């Protein structure tokens, strides 16, 4: 009984405390709600740690938390409620701070977005102003993107890069010159006439007085007239094309960045700047003033000779310019058409194009036919231009190694040998007269040559002679099939020189002419040695032997190439015996060093050296006697 009474008393006390605490808890937790009964409070306390939807907490754990709360409330309700109030106030304070931070961030973002918007608007306004300043952007029907506008601006600046302020603005003349003086100087320098023509109808707005010197027109008779009335009918379309002002701006291909297509513009110039695409230069034929021609006797009254109108070829150069209509005095015509666009016209200078009269001879002026050859000091070809094949018929390899004198006509040898000696002794260019050169087909072509020598700058030795050969038209001569006597020479020279017809060799050239160049080279070299050396030992035995045994090629070329006479053979035999006797007693070779050197030079004389050896063998071995060829089985 006592226990039951104590439990009842404890429950009573607990109920009283709960009744006292319930209003406080209800006021703290939900200030807008009124205090409820004990049952509602207990149910509220039991439902406080209810599991939230979607949480992973265990229901048993939530029950344990509820029991702990009840236990704390039963032990010290006031302390627990005060601690709970502090936690609630702290959480509410943190929530307030988070809200203030969010408000500040939102305000900052709004300010930043407003700044960016103002920047974009300012950039768009600048792009629009830039597009309004660029002539290529004005006539566009649709709005261009920013990248296209910037590209057009760059192209426009590039087109103006080559222009100077003196040609763009109004200050195009020096301050000390007046407009009339400057115009007079321009017309005097250009030797033409200045004119201004409207681009729409071709109306002549202005023409200078100097037009009377070229076209025989008065200044007043042309002003206000149409230029197309004075043009040749075949030139009207061309001049209209030049007067068209659709391409007054620079001709650039513009690509839209969005679509990737080319931007086509129909430009109407509204500024006075001179663009690179506005320059005009063309030729046209303009009528001159009527010239009365006197009627000749026997001519019909309606003859075309009564009135003669002549066309002159005029070279027109200038620029297309645009002005407001009120400046050029065209406002009335513009008002009648209700057109407020600028007036475009051509400002140009016309110059008379000279007419070249063709030659009466009928010959056409063409570039002269030339080819280049190089030959050594002795006249042998070392280089032949490929163009020589079309003129001479020889391949370059056919001429290499041969002497140029083998192809020169014999009548030109004297002149060419003098030129050959001159070019070896001089560093200047030597011009030859016209001479005949034998072609491959046997005919002779006439050439003129310019010779000059080339000296090696390191060795200081003359290496070769350069010959620039020019073909002289209309002077080719066919080869002669029969023998022609050399009438220019004396009877004595003609009797000594053998003019034989050799198969495969055209007449007009000399047999053995290949040695002429070598003789000239040796002569010039000897002359240079004599001039360079101050002393020459001619009295030494070696010099005597050299003088005795040296073969003179020049004398051989002029002598008759036949067996010597018996007296000459005797002298030659005696000389040979004396030479052998001297060689035996002196124990020296038959030929001295000088003779051996001259023997080498003799071998370079080609045909002359071979003829000399044949004469010597005929004299020594009896090869010149007729032989018995009866035993030979073939016919000769």
Swiss-Prot record:
A GO term, aspect molecular function: DNA-binding transcription factor activity, RNA polymerase II-specific
Cross-link (Glycyl lysine isopeptide (Lys-Gly) (interchain with G-Cter in SUMO2 and SUMO3)): 287
Domain (PAC) ranges: 432-475
Protein induction: Constitutively expressed. Has no circadian rhythm expression pattern.
Gene Ontology biological process: circadian regulation of gene expression; circadian rhythm; entrainment of circadian clock; positive regulation of circadian rhythm; positive regulation of DNA-templated transcription; positive regulation of transcription by RNA polymerase II; regulation of DNA-templated transcription; regulation of transcription by RNA polymerase II
Signal peptide: none
Intervals of motif Nuclear export signal 2: 392-400
Domain bHLH, chain residue ranges per copy: 107-160
Crosslink (Glycyl lysine isopeptide (Lys-Gly) (interchain with G-Cter in SUMO2)) position: 294
Any one Pfam family match given in the protein's UniProt record, by short name: PAS_11
Domain PAS as annotated: residue spans: 178-250, 357-427
UniProt keyword list: Activator, Biological rhythms, DNA-binding, Isopeptide bond, Nucleus, Repeat, Transcription, Transcription regulation, Ubl conjugation
Tissue occurrence: Expressed in fetal brain. Highly expressed in brain and placenta. Lower levels in heart, liver, thymus, kidney and lung. Located to endothelial cells and neuronal cells of the suprachiasmatic nucleus (SCN). Also detected in endothelial cells of the heart, lung and kidney. In the brain, specifically expressed in the thalamus, hippocampus and amygdala.
Compartments it resides in: Nucleus
Motif stretch (Nuclear localization signal): 49-54
PROSITE patterns documented for this protein: BHLH (PS50888), PAS (PS50112)
Region of interest: Disordered: 25-62
Region (Interaction with PER2): 46-258
Gene3D superfamilies the UniProt entry points to: Helix-loop-helix DNA-binding domain, PAS domain
Complexes and interactors: Component of the circadian core oscillator, which includes the CRY proteins, CLOCK, or NPAS2, BMAL1 or BMAL2, CSNK1D and/or CSNK1E, TIMELESS and the PER proteins. Interacts directly with CLOCK to form the BMAL2-CLOCK transactivator. Can form heterodimers or homodimers which interact directly with CLOCK to form the transcription activator. Interacts with NPAS2 and HIF1A. Interacts with PER2.
Role: Transcriptional activator which forms a core component of the circadian clock. The circadian clock, an internal time-keeping system, regulates various physiological processes through the generation of approximately 24 hour circadian rhythms in gene expression, which are translated into rhythms in metabolism and behavior. It is derived from the Latin roots 'circa' (about) and 'diem' (day) and acts as an important regulator of a wide array of physiological functions including metabolism, sleep, body temperature, blood pressure, endocrine, immune, cardiovascular, and renal function.
Official protein name in the record: Basic helix-loop-helix ARNT-like protein 2
Species annotation: Homo sapiens (Human)
Source organism phylogeny: Eukaryota, Metazoa, Chordata, Craniata, Vertebrata
Encoding gene per record: BMAL2
